[in-house]
């Protein structure tokens, strides 16, 4: 991954821990740039990256399992500080001549350690709570190492070779359950690796703009804009770098939220004076979706049609050499490490044609989602746009269960607008990770005035989450839910019932389709 030479880097090597991205994020929160790479990275690549420190992540394997993950032991001879976490500590012990064995019982959960070190534990109390998760245990440390923390269950909760600046901890400092975990990581990054913490969004913008200008020169760039946070930030960053050399194509497939298409044109076309081509393709999409009720088929049709529409418009433009995409660092990690696992396929509108002869520009592919939001604020994008709700590529097409019709889309569009308005008025928009309405393929009997009705049911989905991988339903106050329900049944035609989804993820997903 491209990186400014003067930028401090902490390299995290991935051994399959569910917390590996968290390590990277914790370090970035300290103002120090960090990247996650596969454990099989070569010594030559590491030297080229010139990291200030290396962290070996945890992992689910035993160091003695056949085919278990390992590293080139030469890493320990580079003169770069190394911190091994759980599996990383066990692997370090084994590779440097110590002994590791299977524990009688897997140690999982909170534990109390007694620490002593003027480096890793500097300024921290001796007794502290940590989070353990391991099935192997160290029984003999390598030559040159000493114990710097123990616990009731192990004599080797943390070890160090101070001369070579190699450290190991048998717990996870990156998780919130570890009482002083952030402080320990900060000690490693600042005290041991001597990082100054100068990585900011302001610096990121300066570096990226210079990289974009050098690469693009006087050529032109095309950007597929959806109005979502990622594509919006990419477009504004590129526009700041190259101005009118950027052209954005906004495909309006007719499956957007209320007023969304006009908002994109107003905020970005007029507000940022960007060159945006709006393609009204609603009829084209609706014709393709007619009679289709299977969710996977709907998603595929929407994705494919988006590609065809974009391709048609792109072919009308001459002299375009680059295509910009809002790829995030999580996408890079999932596609770039052997140990990564995709929990769920995402709702991104399908990939663009392979035969499109463009060079790719992905200016935010080193950032996590929360960092992209910070970047957006730094670029001057209004907060209400930066903090917009995540919206799937197929749009309302997967929030109308079953066949999509204009009438059903209007019900979802209007009910969703009411939900968002009330949530905003109640000041809950930052407390709830995601909230939206869905239209199940359900009708029920009701009474409105003196008349019997047989109309649609609207479902409300609102969840709290940290990263979207797991979530819980939001505990919205009953009076607020009543207000939302009352407004929907009174203001949206053909709705006589509102229900609230109280399912967590897992077992359900956040979206209904």
Swiss-Prot record:
Active site, UniProt feature: 86, 172, 174
Task: Give the keywords, sorted.
Answer: ATP-binding, Glutamine amidotransferase, GMP biosynthesis, Ligase, Nucleotide-binding, Purine biosynthesis
- Please give the InterPro entries that the UniProt record associates with this protein: Class_I_gatase-like (IPR029062), GATASE (IPR017926), GMP_synth_C (IPR001674), GMP_synth_GATase (IPR004739), GMP_synthase (IPR022955), GMPS_ATP_PPase_dom (IPR025777), Rossmann-like_a/b/a_fold (IPR014729)
CDD domains named in the record: GATase1_GMP_Synthase, GMP_synthase_C
- GO-annotated cellular components: cytosol
Q: What is its EC number?
A: 6.3.5.2
Q: Where does ATP bind?
A: 226-232
Provide the GO MF annotations for this entry.
ATP binding; GMP synthase activity
What HAMAP family does the database record attribute to this sequence? GMP_synthase
In terms of NCBIfam families, this protein maps to:
guaA_Cterm, guaA_Nterm, PRK00074.1
Q: Relate the assembly described in the record.
A: Homodimer.
Q: What task does this protein carry out?
A: Catalyzes the synthesis of GMP from XMP.
- Protein name (record): GMP synthase [glutamine-hydrolyzing]
């Amino acid at each position: 991954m491209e990186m400014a030479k003067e930028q401090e880097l902490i390299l995290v090597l991935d051994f399959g821990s569910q917390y590996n991205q968290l390590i990277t994020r914790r370090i970035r929160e300290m103002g120090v740039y960090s990247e996650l790479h596969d454990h099989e990275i070569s010594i030559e690549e590491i030297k080229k990256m010139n990291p200030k420190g290396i962290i070996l992540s945890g992992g689910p394997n035993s160091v003695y399992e056949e085919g278990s993950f390992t590293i080139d032991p030469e890493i320990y001879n580079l003169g770069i500080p190394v911190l091994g976490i759980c599996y990383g500590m066990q692997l370090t012990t084994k590779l440097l001549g110590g002994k590791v064995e299977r524990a009688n019982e897997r140690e999982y959960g909170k534990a109390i350690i007694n620490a002593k070190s003027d480096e890793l534990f500097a300024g921290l109390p001796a007794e502290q709570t940590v989070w353990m998760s391991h099935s192997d245990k160290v029984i003999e440390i390598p030559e040159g190492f000493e114990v710097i923390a123990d616990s009731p269950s192990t004599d080797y909760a943390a070890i160090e070779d101070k001369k070579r600046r190699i450290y190991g901890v048998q717990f996870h400092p990156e998780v919130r359950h570890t009482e002083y975990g952030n402080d320990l990581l900060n000690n490693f990054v600042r005290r041991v690796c001597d990082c100054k913490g100068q990585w900011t969004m302001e610096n990121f913008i300066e570096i990226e703009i210079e990289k974009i200008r050098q690469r693009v020169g006087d050529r032109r760039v095309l950007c597929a804009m959806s109005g979502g946070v990622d594509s919006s930030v990419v477009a504004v960053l590129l526009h700041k770098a190259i101005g009118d050399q950027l052209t954005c194509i906004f495909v309006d497939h007719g499956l957007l939220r209320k007023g969304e298409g006009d908002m994109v044109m107003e905020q970005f076309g007029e507000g940022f004076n960007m060159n945006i081509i709006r393609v009204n393709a609603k009829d084209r999409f609706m014709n393709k979706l007619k009679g289709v009720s299977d969710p996977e088929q709907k998603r595929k049709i929407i994705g494919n049609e988006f590609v065809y529409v974009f391709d048609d418009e792109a072919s009308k433009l001459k002299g375009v050499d680059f295509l910009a995409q809002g790829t995030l660092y999580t996408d890079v990690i999932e596609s770039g490490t052997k140990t990564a696992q995709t929990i769920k396929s995402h709702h991104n509108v399908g990939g663009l044609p392979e035969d499109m002869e463009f060079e790719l520009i992905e200016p935010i592919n080193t950032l996590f989602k929360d960092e992209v939001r910070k970047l957006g604020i730094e670029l001057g994008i209004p907060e209400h746009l930066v903090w917009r709700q995540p919206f799937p590529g197929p749009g309302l097409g997967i929030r109308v269960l079953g066949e999509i019709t204009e009438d059903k889309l209007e019900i979802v569009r209007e009910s969703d607008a009411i939900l968002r308005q009330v949530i905003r008025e109640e000041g809950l928009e930052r407390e709830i990770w995601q909230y939206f309405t869905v239209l199940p393929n359900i009708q029920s009997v009701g009474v409105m005035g003196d008349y019997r009705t047989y109309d649609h049911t609207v479902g409300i989905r609102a969840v709290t989450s940290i990263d979207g991988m797991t979530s819980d339903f939001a505990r919205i106050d009953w009076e607020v839910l009543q207000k939302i329900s009352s407004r929907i049944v009174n203001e949206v035609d053909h709705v006589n019932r509102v229900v609230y989804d109280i399912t967590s993820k897992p077992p359900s997903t956040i979206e209904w389709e």
